[in-house]
Each structure stands twice: as C-alpha cells, then as structure tokens.
Amino acid sequence: MDQQVKQERLQGRLEPEIKEFRQERKTLQLATVDAQGRPNVSYAPFVQNQEGYFVLISHIARHARNLEVNPQVSIMMIEDETEAKQLFARKRLTFDAVASMVERDSELWCQVIAQMGERFGEIIDGLSQLQDFMLFRLQPEQGLFVKGFGQAYQVSGDDLVDFVHLEEGHRKISNG
C-alpha cells in the first residue's frame, strides 16, 4: 500500500475522532509567556469554528496580558484523569497558535459571542458586556494528537493528520 493511500485512510479514521474529542472538551489549557519571558499556564473555556479557537478572558488575568505582549501561545485539550486508561498517556490535542484580539464592534465578535452563549449559557451575556473582558482568536498552526503510547499524530491547524510522526517511537536506555 502506498504512502498516499495510508495517509488517506489515517485521515478518514482520525479526523472524526479528533473532532469528537475536541467537542467533548469545554476548556483548553493555555501556555503563555510574558514580556520578560516568564511562562504561565492557565485555562479558559473555548469555542472553535472555521476561524480558529476563541477564548473570552479578562484583561485582569495574567494570560490575557501575556497574549497582548506575546501572541505566541500553546493550547491543549486533554482527557479527564478519571476517564484515562493510563495517566502517563492521556489522550490530548495540542497546537502551537497565534493569538489576536477580536474587535468588539466586528461581525466576528458578534458571531463568536453568540456561539459562546449557546455553549456556556447566560454567563456570556454578562461577561461580554464587561469592559475588561476581551475575545481572543487563537489561530492554530502545527499540532499533535496523542491517543496513547506510540499513537501520536502530527495535525495541521485544519485537522489534516500527518503520517510521518508514526515512524518515531520510544527506545530503551542501553546499558552499554
């Protein structure tokens, strides 16, 4: 079987699984960096559509200020510990992404706030009216979908699965 056929089969099998996994998650973890290069890990509820991932966060929060000065962010959605078969290999989807602020008076703001309202309820009406809350778009670039040990797949921002990562594996330490 040639590489392209393998790639198409892998895409057909994993794309629905990735979409289902993402839809089951309501929050994502954010790894941001401040102007001095200090890392910060946090989380935020999110929605996702063809434009990217979106988080509505307060300027008071450290991660929002970090995104303003350094738009490079890493995001992760991860399987709940109670659902994991193995804690050392929890299912997860991660992306390197670039953040940009969505203007309040834009059509995109209105669309995404409505989408958030459908997903999270009336709290979005209140939060979106607060001056310190900002809507960030997180545009995914390269990512990784990990299903377990030896099951890691490179994923592009538009969920295209790359077969290449399957060739790498764990190796024991040699006692030489």
UniProtKB/Swiss-Prot annotation:
What Pfam family does this protein match (any one)? PNPOx_N
Q: How is its activity regulated?
A: Activity is pH-dependent. A proximal hydrogen bond between Asp-132 and the heme axial ligant His-170 is essential for heme degradation activity. Heme-degradation reaction is inhibited by iron chelators.
The EC number(s) attached to this protein equal: 1.14.99.58
Molecular function (GO) terms for this protein are: coenzyme F420 binding; metal ion binding; oxidoreductase activity, acting on the CH-CH group of donors
Catalyzed chemical reaction(s):
heme b + 3 AH2 + 3 O2 + 2 H(+) = biliverdin IXbeta + CO + Fe(2+) + 3 A + 3 H2O; heme b + 3 AH2 + 3 O2 + 3 H(+) = biliverdin IXdelta + CO + Fe(2+) + 3 A + 3 H2O
Residues binding heme, per UniProt: H170
Substituting D132 to L/N results in: At pH 8.0, slight decrease in heme affinity. Almost complete loss of heme degradation activity
Site described as Important for activity, located at D132
Spell out the SUPFAM superfamilies in the cross-references: FMN-binding split barrel
Q: What does this protein do?
A: Involved in heme degradation. Catalyzes the degradation of heme to biliverdin, with the release of iron. Forms biliverdin beta and delta. Binds heme with high efficiency.
What family is this?
A: Belongs to the heme oxygenase HugZ/HutZ family.
Check the record and name the NCBIfam families matching this protein: heme_HutZ
How does this protein assemble? Homodimer. Interacts with HutX, leading to the transfer of the heme from HutX to apo-HutZ.
What this protein is called in its record is Heme oxygenase HutZ
Species? Vibrio cholerae serotype O1 (strain ATCC 39315 / El Tor Inaba N16961)
**Taxonomic path:** Bacteria, Pseudomonadati, Pseudomonadota, Gammaproteobacteria, Vibrionales
